[in-house]
Amino acid sequence: MIHHDPTFWLLARASGITAYVLLTCSVLAGLVVKSRPFGRKVKTASVTDVHRVFALLGLGMIALHGVALVLDQTVRMPVAALFVPFLSHYRPGAVAWGVLTAELAALITVSFSLRSRIGARNWRRLHWATYLVFLMGTVHGLTAGTDASQPWARALYLGAVGSVVFATAWRVLTRPVRPTPALERSA
């Protein structure tokens, strides 16, 4: 009987789940920056810093997740499968969601530093893709994650999706109405 050390498999699972939680927190912090549910009690700059830290830590956990999968003897993930969708022999479609999620998350995270070069409007447009990253990451976790059928994992995904939906609804419903120029003239 061949015995495989489960260390990297456990690390891959833990880092994947941790990455999902951190990226969920980043999305929520980003929504808090714009919707300001706490009014002026919490400084926008502080929440923005927290948002960035969650994003960077999440990206680090995604990288650790990929490295652990490559080093694990059970899955035997080729390095190229971390960068090219559908190269994985383990659940290729489900893993492809993760590859695309990681790449888009990296692009959005790098855009923090490029905001002045690409312009605020383009940066904001790119930032809307965060919702796509969150959705793809959720699909990846539910379809590739070996713990996805566990009650605690289902509760985690449901809580994350519910929180993002609620925070998004809050942002949309509490957005101040800006008068149009025509309305301003008639007033």
Residue ranges and their predicted role:
Residues 1-187:
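Membrane-embedded alpha-helical bundles that constitute the cytochrome b-like, heme-associated redox core
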